[in-house]
Amino acid sequence: MSGQETAVIEAVAQWQITHPQPYFKRVQVFVARETGGRRLSLVESDTAPPWTFSVRSGKSSPENERQLAENLNEAREQFRVSNEKPVELAQPPFGVFLEKGLQPIWSEPGIGWAPILEKHPGADYVVSFCRPGFNSAGTFAVMELTEASRDTEPCDWVFQLRRIDEGTWEVRTAKMITERSSTGRPSR
C-alpha cells in the first residue's frame, strides 16, 4: 500500500474462538507479501484459541467511512450500556510475525517498527494484533491492529467484532486512529 492511497483494510473473514474466556495472552500472525491488493492469509495460531482471519486492501470511500464509523459507534455504545471498560487498546502488540521465514518477534514497550523492518529485509508488510476487549454480554468486541510497511509509517486501526454464533466472530474494520513515527510513538 502506498501512502497516497491511505488504504482501509476492508475485508475480514471469520474469527474462531473456542476458549471459554476469549482473551488472547499472545497472538501469532502469519504475514504474506502484500502486492497491489493481494490477499493476505493469516492462519491458525498454536498458542491462542483457534482462529482464522483474512485481509485485503482497498481504497477508502465515503460510504465505507460512514459504515465503519457506525460500526465503531455501535461497539462503543455496547460497552457503555454494559458499564464494562474495554481492554486498553494502546498497549504494545503481543506478537509479530514477519514474512521472511515467519520468525517470531515478541515486542516490548517502546519498540520501534523501523528496527524490525531493518532486521528482516524480506518483510514487505508487518501486522500485529492487540488483545480485544469484550462487552459483558459477549456480543461485541473491539481490538486494535497495527500495520507497517516499507512504504508507509506504522498506523493503528480499531476493529469491531460481532458474535455470529457460539465460538464464531465476524470481524469488521473501523477507522484508522493513529499514525506513528518510526519510533513507534503516536504522532497525533
Where are these regions (language model features)?
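Flexible low-complexity loop/turn motifs enriched in small/helix-breaking residues
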Residues: 1-154, 177-188
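Short beta-strand edge/turn micro-motifs at domain boundaries
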Residues: 157-181
